[in-house]
Amino acid sequence: MFTLKKSLLLLFFLGTISLSLCEEERNADDDERRDDPDEMDVEVENRSAVGRHSRRFGLRKHRKH
């Protein structure tokens, strides 16, 4: 039983480290993309396309006038 707990704790610890490293890498990639003007244009286009589709399918809340 003790070795099982040790193994599970080790797996949890390694998984946590792995996730934190992935988040750091993703954040670094996002920062690099923001610095590139071409990538910024693509991000804006993607956001507008998502907005159009979400309104079309009723996923976005309508504004009250």
Swiss-Prot record:
Residues 1-22 form the signal peptide. Its main location: secreted. Expressed by the skin glands. Keywords: Amphibian defense peptide, Antibiotic, Antimicrobial, Secreted, Signal. It is found in: Secreted. Residues 26-43 have a biased composition (Acidic residues). One of its GO terms (biological process) is defense response to Gram-negative bacterium. Residues 25-65 are annotated as: Disordered. The keyword 4Fe-4S does not apply. InterPro entries: Frog_antimicrobial_propeptide. Antimicrobial peptide. Belongs to the frog skin active peptide (FSAP) family. Brevinin subfamily. This is Dybowskin-2CDYb.
